[in-house]
Amino acid sequence: MEASTSLLVLVLAAAAFAAGTVTEAAGDGCSAGCDLALASFYVTPNQNVTNMADLFGIGAANYRSLAPYNPNIPNLDFINVGGRVNVYFTCGCRSLPGSPGATYLAGAFPFQMSRGQIYTSVAANYNNLTTAEWLQATNSYPANNIPDTAVINATVNCSCGDASISPDYGLFLTYPLRAEDTLASVAATYGLSSQLDVVRRYNPGMESATGSGIVYIPVKDPNGSYLPLKSPGKGASAGAIAGGVVAGVVVLAAIFLYIIFYRRRKAKQATLLQSSEDSTQLGTISMDKVTPSTIVGPSPVAGITVDKSVEFSYEELSNATQGFSIGNKIGQGGFGAVYYAELRGEKAAIKKMDMQATHEFLAELKVLTHVHHLNLVRLIGYCIESSLFLVYEFIENGNLSQHLRGMGYEPLSWAARIQIALDSARGLEYIHEHTVPVYIHRDIKSANILIDKNYRAKVADFGLTKLTEVGGTSMPTGTRVVGTFGYMPPEYARYGDVSPKVDVYAFGVVLYELISAKEAIVRSTESSSDSKGLVYLFEEALNSPDPKEGLRTLIDPKLGEDYPIDSILKLTQLAKVCTQEDPKLRPSMRSVVVALMTLSSTSEFWDMNNLYENQGLVNLMSGR
């Protein structure tokens, strides 16, 4: 059996073990953790968000997944020294080394020590979220005898709430106090002055603390609501939330990091894809071609069948992009930069990804080597030398976000917008309904819908894609929340629940964008604190005494008067159905495609009676 398959078995076994044991009583301190906690990271000079994401096990390449928890930061690429960034993590119930009965709540993050490092220097990396004394207490290495190559647990304490204090709060921020802070001032910062007595009860003995120590503050989720406390399981300490699956993820992360570290030193060869124009299986080649510093352990593409995808050399990609020059750079995403190139007579877009983005690289490679559709961007090939590279067909007309809000683009006609919506819906319908397994994109937004020279749309950027078995409707709860703020439905942002209806919700937001050309989050001033979601704005218009007039205030001014208001009203109603809070009430992408076909057709001879499951949606679009 291939190494990758063995690793998968190990992962599944560990997950089953964690899920089965984590909710059992583990001692007097706690018996279970919770899916989600936040840490307030104080920004000092020479720090950036990628560093913070790396310290908390999120991965530097995934730093943009912090955006939903930081609505007051307009751009995570520019953070102010002296400010604070909220970082999410799993709050687990853990035991002190050698004392399984002594338990505590904390996030634990594998930290690779280097020569000369001590617990004090590790604590300094976390900016008072932990201490040298606490690191020594939660690790097995003596402070004066830490091996140079040791991987320790960097532990950050957290809270899951307490039912005896309040059932209204289930999400907490670990906040390290600074000289200017008191418990009362921090509570006021988070709008909890009226609940100061409750905050005090969560932080006994901290009322007079200033300048040092940690306090736990109830905070709102990305949708602006307080998460209620989940009912603790039997044997759980007050306020503990059952989080078996997520705790399993923490265990797996540690296992995975250990495997990476071990194979970095021991790997002798790697399994790589064989270049071929035809469908091929993987072969093995000598490590003379790919060194451990380039690819660690087994090739990350092991086990993937590549259908007509070419393995390019680094030299060929470098030559085609003038050494990945600024002049060839055409974009920058959360997982890497994109460069224009001409390869073997074809225009191409090359995404250059950091080695730490292996998960996203694999996800995208796996989807696009198995799934082929007119409305999905086409993968030409890949490269795994020096960095991770994906080579796509070049779509020369930019993305939908640029056409709606960028400079130098001709306004999109209403007919073009409907066609773009239909093309995008067809791409999503294909991955939801016609692939085995079913794929869930998880990051549908206007920036990930590419427009070709004929103004036809293709869905792109599959780096966050999840998959599920045929007939499955959702992924396990506790999935790490990634994606883009403003496009995430409530069940995903709050609980990590993943199903195809996550994409349906995001697509509904894109429909609102097509109507209004506004961003998913609309800021009425330069201050990001004064903002509203596009979903809210349209619901407000639809609930007004005259919905058509309400909508006119939101319609893209670039359309002028060149639009049928009835068509806009119907598309708005479709978007509203897609963005319903209850995922069960949202239509499938199959029904959305039918509705858009009806809306885009001028024919009176559509036979809608035999099409798909949502006849009411069809009737809505056809005006019946």
Curated annotation (Swiss-Prot):
Keywords: ATP-binding, Cell membrane, Chitin-binding, Disulfide bond, Glycoprotein, Immunity, Innate immunity, Kinase, Membrane, Nucleotide-binding, Plant defense, Receptor, Serine/threonine-protein kinase, Signal, Transferase, Transmembrane, Transmembrane helix. The active site is at D443 (proton acceptor). GO terms for molecular function: ATP binding; chitin binding; protein serine kinase activity; protein serine/threonine kinase activity; transmembrane receptor protein kinase activity. Residues 173-218 form the LysM domain. GO terms for cellular component: plasma membrane. Disruption phenotype: Suppression of the defense responses induced by chitin oligosaccharides. This is Chitin elicitor receptor kinase 1.
